[in-house]
Regions:
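Active-site loop segments of alpha/beta catalytic cores
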Residues: 1-142
Length: 142
């Protein structure tokens, strides 16, 4: 289950703490309880507060299994902020790279892999956001 806060990056840290964080925390705390009450299996929970890199430390404490990252934070910086908390990152290739050459896409992926530590644990390769509407009108050729 993925929770998007597409405007999180437009909020100051204090405004995020007041108007977004409580609701994101409520979902991560109460959804597993409700699923259990309904006799349903637990599901992995992902939060994607787009652009809220200034509050990544707080987001890593919200109780989600996975935190989605946009392309505006370096993976290595996100890893430093996360520390040893058991949070997996998802992202964070710039969607615009899809307009590039095969070589530029490969270079972007290699940088992302390296930034997340080069291993196979603790992150999920993905774009740092969905495709733009422009891509629907002018799809990438690679």
């Amino acid at each position: 289950m993925q929770v998007f806060d597409s405007w999180a990056g437009e909020l100051s840290p204090s405004t995020f703490k007041q108007f977004s964080e409580p609701f994101l925390a409520h979902i991560s705390k109460h959804l597993p309880i409700r699923l259990k009450e309904l006799g349903l299996d637990q599901v992995p929970m992902i939060v994607f507060p787009k652009g809220a890199n200034q509050v990544l430390d707080s987001v890593c404490n919200l109780g989600y299994h996975v935190v989605g990252l946009d392309w505006l934070i370096e993976p290595s910086e996100a890893v430093k902020i996360r520390g040893d908390r058991p949070v997996v990152f998802q992202g964070n290739a710039d969607p615009g790279v899809l307009y590039g050459t095969e070589k530029s896409i490969s270079e972007t992926v290699e940088q992302m892999v390296s930034g997340f530590g080069g291993g196979k644990k603790g992150w999920i390769a993905n774009l740092g956001h969905g495709r733009s509407n422009i891509m629907l009108l002018n799809p990438p050729s690679v």
